[in-house]
From Swiss-Prot:
Name of the protein: UPF0761 membrane protein KPK_5501
InterPro entries in UniProt: UPF0761_bac, Virul_fac_BrkB
HAMAP family assigned to the protein according to its UniProt record, in alphabetical order: UPF0761 (MF_00672)
Residues annotated as transmembrane: 44-64, 74-94, 104-124, 140-160, 183-203, 210-230, 244-264
Compartments where found: Cell inner membrane
Organism whose genome encodes this protein: Klebsiella pneumoniae (strain 342)
Any Pfam family matching the protein: Virul_fac_BrkB
Domain of life: Bacteria
Similarity remark: Belongs to the UPF0761 family.
This protein's GO CC annotations: plasma membrane
Length: 286
C-alpha cells in the first residue's frame, strides 16, 4: 500500500521537477536578473516622464480631473509599498516642474516614456527568443496607443466604478463590494500581466500559458509587496544608513524586485509551452 502511494507520488512529482529544472535553466540562460536590472534602471529614468505624460493627458480632459486624483492615490497605495506617500510627494513635485517645460522638453518626455516601452518589448522578446521584429512604424503606433489610450481607459473604468458605487442599490452590497475592492489590485495585476505576455512577444503565445504565468506573477507581486513593506518597516536599515535620501535606494530595490517578478512570470509562460513541446516530441519518437 505504502509502496503504491510512493509510486503515484513519484509519478506526479517527476514531471513537476522536470519542468522546474527546465525553468531554472531558462532563467540562467536568459540572464533574467540582469534583464531585470536593466529594466529597473530604464524605469527609474522614465518614471517621472511617463507619469508626467499620463497626467498631462488627464489634464487635457476635464471630466477626468477628479478621477486622476483617485488613480494617483490608488497607484501609490497599492503598487508602491511602505514609502508610497513620500515617493508620491517627490514625483508630484517633479511633474509640477515638468508642466513648465517647452515643446522640446515635452517631446523629450514622450521619447523617454517610449524608451521604457521599447526596453520592455526587447526584454520579453529576448525571453521568448523571438527573432521576428515588428515594423518600426507599427511598434511606435502600439507604444503610442498604450501611452495614450491606457490611462484614459483606466480613468473611464474608475469613473464608471465610482458612479455605480454611488447608486442607492449599491449600499445593500457593501460586504461584497469591500471584498471585490480588496481583490481589485490582484485582478488588475493579473489582467495587466496577461496582456503583457500575450501581446508584446512577436511570436504566438498560448492563452492558457499566459493566464497561468500572469496569475503566478500577480500573486508574487501582491505577496512581494506585503513582504517588502514588512521588511522596510521592521528593519529600517536603509533609513539609518541613507537618512533623508533613503527613498532612492528603496524605490530602486522595489522596482528591481518588481521586474524580477514580471520576467519570472514571462519565463513561466515560455517554459510551459516549451515543456509541452518537449513532451510531444518524446511521445512521437519511436
Amino acid at each position: 500500500m505504502l509502496k503504491t502511494v510512493q509510486q503515484k507520488l513519484h509519478h506526479h512529482t517527476r514531471p513537476l521537477l522536470a519542468w522546474l529544472k527546465l525553468l531554472w535553466r531558462r532563467i540562467d540562460e536568459d540572464h533574467m536578473t540582469t534583464l531585470a536590472g536593466n529594466l529597473a534602471y530604464v524605469s527609474l529614468l522614465s518614471l517621472v516622464p511617463l507619469i508626467a505624460v499620463v497626467f498631462a493627458l488627464f489634464a487635457a480632459f476635464p471630466m477626468f480631473s477628479e478621477v486622476s486624483v483617485q488613480i494617483r492615490h490608488f497607484i501609490f497605495a497599492n503598487f508602491i509599498p511602505a514609502t508610497g506617500d513620500v515617493i508620491q510627494g517627490y514625483i508630484e513635485q517633479f511633474v509640477a516642474n515638468s508642466s513648465r517645460m517647452t515643446a522640446v522638453g515635452a517631446f523629450g518626455l514622450i521619447v523617454t516614456s517610449l524608451l521604457l516601452m521599447y526596453s520592455i518589448d526587447s526584454a520579453l522578446n529576448t525571453i521568448w527568443r523571438s527573432t521576428r521584429s515588428r515594423p518600426k512604424v507599427y511598434s511606435f503606433a502600439v507604444y503610442w496607443m498604450i501611452l495614450t489610450l491606457g490611462p484614459l481607459l483606466a480613468g473611464a473604468s474608475l469613473a464608471i466604478s465610482s458612479y455605480l458605487l454611488s447608486l442607492r442599490w449599491a449600499s445593500d452590497l457593501d460586504g461584497v463590494i469591500d471584498n471585490l475592492l480588496r481583490l481589485f489590485p490582484l485582478i488588475l495585476s493579473w489582467a495587466a500581466f496577461w496582456l503583457l505576455y500575450s501581446i508584446v512577444p512577436t511570436t504566438q503565445v498560448r492563452n492558457r500559458d499566459a493566464v497561468i504565468g500572469a496569475l503566478v506573477a500577480a500573486l508574487l507581486f501582491e505577496a512581494g509587496k506585503k513582504a517588502f513593506a514588512l521588511y522596510i518597516t521592521t528593519f529600517p536599515s536603509y533609513q539609518l544608513i541613507y537618512g533623508v535620501i533613503s527613498v532612492v535606494p528603496i524605490l530602486f530595490v522595489w522596482v528591481y524586485w518588481t521586474w524580477c517578478i514580471v520576467l519570472l512570470g514571462a519565463e513561466i509562460t515560455v517554459t510551459l509551452g516549451e515543456y509541452r513541446k518537449l513532451k510531444t516530441e518524446e511521445t512521437e519518437q519511436p
